[in-house]
């Protein structure tokens, strides 16, 4: 009876029902426990109620400053704690960044994301960052930055420059978090998300699965995002790319059974779609090792955004040509027009899951 009640309450979040931010862990766990085909059916219903079926947003991610990060994230090859062979670089010149953005636009990307391996940006770097944002926007592309933690003042500067999105992932569940990173707290991450939201910038926040976590951790990860006062406009779901020389990469090389299987990854995408119906759910790192069949299941489960191009920061990624061929085989097309949450904000009709 209790499971039935939970699933009946969960169904209130489907279709055109109000967006919920009061999900319980029990409800989310019940979704994960559904028969796989039933979960996909429910996720597809939610997706079609809020998004255009068959359209997938194309984004490009560029590392504008690689390596040398003082954080100890166990998955990251750019940490100074990792023995990954990644060499630290200086911040890219603005013109080179804009050249990369122009190429991404020519390849069909609508959003250009720029990432720097910093704990937080220094004030001396802000003028160059602002020039990058303005230059990319002048091309008619959406902009996203991921620079580490932000102060309210820095968030305001990025907002004034016209930044559309800021990415700051929560990585995993609050309980698992300290096993992955110790140099920045879970609360620190939430504070940066608050600073971004308060500055009027759209939030991009997700995490990584396949780090040896349990399903309970995946439940906690989705719960942490789905119960934010306002859902992230974008939710990237990464599958860990185990890199030699990183803590987690070396751990999983020795314990391959700790890796997440494809069906469980698709389940995570589906539960994210059901609990955050208006958000863009993005397939991010790890996609290059997924079969087209697995990716097709992810699209059926509600994923409607991908990173395209040959590289994501330091990890390999499916290239533009491979993605174009996959889109043709699956009958998908690049997304046009505004995302649902942004469109609702522009007409003043957003409630429950959108930013003010």
Swiss-Prot record:
Subunit structure: Homodimer.
GO BP: biotin biosynthetic process
Name of the protein: Biotin synthase
Pathway recorded for this protein: Cofactor biosynthesis; biotin biosynthesis; biotin from 7,8-diaminononanoate: step 2/2
GO molecular function: 2 iron, 2 sulfur cluster binding; 4 iron, 4 sulfur cluster binding; biotin synthase activity; iron ion binding
Catalytic function, reaction form: (4R,5S)-dethiobiotin + (sulfur carrier)-SH + 2 reduced [2Fe-2S]-[ferredoxin] + 2 S-adenosyl-L-methionine = (sulfur carrier)-H + biotin + 2 5'-deoxyadenosine + 2 L-methionine + 2 oxidized [2Fe-2S]-[ferredoxin]
Cited Gene3D superfamilies: Aldolase class I (3.20.20.70)
Free-text remark on how the cofactor is bound: Binds 1 [4Fe-4S] cluster. The cluster is coordinated with 3 cysteines and an exchangeable S-adenosyl-L-methionine.
InterPro entries assigned to the protein according to its UniProt record, in alphabetical order: Aldolase_TIM, BATS_dom, Biotin_synth/BioAB, Biotin_synthase, Elp3/MiaA/NifB-like_rSAM, rSAM
Binding, [2Fe-2S] cluster: 113, 144, 204, 282
Cofactors, names only: [4Fe-4S] cluster; [2Fe-2S] cluster
Residues of the Radical SAM core domain: 54-278
Top-level taxon in the UniProt lineage: Bacteria
Family: Belongs to the radical SAM superfamily. Biotin synthase family.
């Amino acid at each position: 009876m209790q499971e039935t009640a939970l699933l009946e309450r969960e169904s209130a979040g489907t279709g055109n029902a109000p967006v919920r931010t009061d999900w319980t862990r029990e409800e989310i766990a019940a979704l994960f426990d559904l028969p796989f085909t039933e979960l996909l059916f429910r996720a597809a219903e939610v997706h079609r109620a809020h998004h255009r079926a068959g359209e997938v947003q194309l984004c490009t991610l560029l590392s504008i400053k690689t390596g040398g990060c003082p954080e100890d994230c166990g998955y990251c090859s750019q940490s100074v704690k990792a023995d990954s062979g990644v060499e630290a670089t200086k911040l890219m010149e603005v013109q080179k960044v804009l050249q990369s953005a122009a190429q991404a636009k020519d390849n069909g990307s609508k959003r250009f994301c720029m990432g720097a391996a910093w704990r937080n940006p220094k004030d001396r770097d802000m003028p160059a960052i602002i020039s990058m944002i303005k230059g990319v926007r002048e091309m008619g592309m959406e902009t996203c930055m991921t620079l580490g933690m932000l102060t309210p003042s820095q968030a305001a500067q990025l907002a004034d420059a016209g930044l559309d999105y800021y990415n700051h992932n929560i990585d995993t569940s609050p309980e698992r978090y300290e096993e992955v990173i110790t140099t920045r707290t879970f609360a620190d991450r939430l504070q940066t998300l608050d600073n971004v939201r308060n500055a009027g910038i759209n939030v991009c926040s997700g995490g990584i699965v396949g780090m040896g976590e349990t399903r309970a951790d995946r439940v906690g990860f989705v719960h942490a995002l789905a119960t934010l006062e306002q859902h992230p406009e974008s939710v990237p779901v990464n599958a860990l790319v185990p890199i030699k020389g990183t803590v987690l990469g070396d751990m999983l090389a020795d314990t391959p059974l700790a890796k997440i299987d494809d069906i469980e990854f698709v389940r995570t995408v589906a539960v994210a779609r059901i609990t955050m119906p208006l958000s863009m759910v993005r397939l991010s790192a790890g996609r290059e090792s997924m079969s087209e069949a697995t990716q097709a299941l992810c699209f059926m489960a509600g994923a409607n955004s991908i990173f395209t191009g040959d590289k994501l920061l330091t990890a390999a990624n499916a290239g533009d040509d491979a993605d174009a061929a996959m889109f043709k085989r699956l009958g998908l097309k690049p997304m046009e027009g505004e995302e649902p949450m942004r469109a609702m904000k522009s007409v003043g009709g957003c409630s429950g899951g959108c930013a003010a």
